[in-house]
Amino acid sequence: MNLIFSKYSVFFILFAFFAFPLSGQANDSVIVTFTGILLAKSCDITTGSKDQSVKMGTYDANEFLNVGDVSPSQTFTINVQGCPTAKSTVYSSGVSANVRFTGDADAINSALLRLSAGADSATGLGIEILDNNDVAIAINGESGFRDLVLNENGDANLTFKLRYKSTQENVHAGQANALLYFDIDYQ
């Protein structure tokens, strides 16, 4: 019986040693900060919308006689799918999207997308981006958050327009190509 009592006594002494710090132990405190982000489900950009080629058309350089002259607009669409719908527990009032267009700004009018440089490139104009209400969106600017009109599958179309806009009175003919990137933020 004494042997069993001794085992429990040793256990109790060890437990007390670790559970109740001695006054001689260091009083250093350690702070551990955890950070992270919890994302709600967002929409997926469809494969066909990721790498688009928009045909801007062929125009006579003489159609751009004054600074600010524009060509007819060409529409392009960014299709998104699988967005959370109003029935979802993630969003109760639908989904809003903000599209940010990035690219090289024109040297004369920084709101326009600069044409790609080359020996046979047109000069004196850039590409203007418009929303579906014909409101200009500056390159490296944002469309602003707008509610997406989702179908029952959570799919939506974001429609924008592009057009040439002259930055000089003397527009020189040539290739008028450019590269535009976009990112979409959801809320």
Please name every model-derived segment:
Residues 2-8, 23-187:
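Mature extracellular/passenger domains of Gram-negative fimbrial/pilin and adhesin proteins
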Residues 10-19:
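Bacterial N-terminal signal peptides
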